[in-house]
């Protein structure tokens, strides 16, 4: 979520700066926005960093698991039909993909203010600071995106976001309204994003899921995802 995965400090490589200096800098940035300092710990980094943070009073607040898939192993959810606008519009994406039981996934090639506002309502984001910061985070994504939604009577009841980068697609913002669970909405959203990414030459997919979310993990495994760590 925005407080943890999306809004965390992630180590991406070695640095010549002293680790204490980097921690202090990150803490100052978070303090400026009146939000808690969040550091992401993964098996890919030096375990001593985890120990260093623990020594400073940091605690584990949120645990996620990473899943990956080679799209050659993708088990797609068969669609019924797709509707395209004129050639070149929407970055070649269909405007609508129809699934059984009249489930219609809408696609856009960019993140709009309307989609973000609907996402906040869908995932229950009410914190004023997050509602102010998160839109700029979405708008700052420098990569190609596949933005998905399902609407009922003009109201978004399911969402998904695919971010394409160097042969990989990441699945983000997979949410379904509580009143619409068990209708294959999440399966339709994920399958649509993965299918369209594959058409664009993407060969691998990844996602993160909250530890203990057995229903989501079952869905992702049925699509072909496997645990990485």
Positions of PLM-derived features:
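A conserved beta-strand-loop-helix scaffold within acyl/acetyltransferase catalytic domains
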Residues: 129-177
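Conserved GNAT acetyl-CoA-binding A-motif
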Residues: 33-42, 197-208
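Acyl-donor-binding surface of acyltransferase catalytic domains
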Residues: 17-113
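A short, internal acetyl-CoA/4′-phosphopantetheine-binding micro-motif in the GNAT/acyltransferase core
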Residues: 10-17, 174-181, 210
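A conserved beta-turn-beta hairpin within the catalytic core of GNAT-like acetyltransferases
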Residues: 2-8, 61, 164-171, 181
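Conserved active-site alpha-helix within GNAT-family acetyltransferase domains
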Residues: 46-60, 187, 211-229
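Conserved acetyl-CoA-binding loop-helix of GNAT-fold acetyltransferases
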Residues: 19-27, 176, 182-195, 199, ...
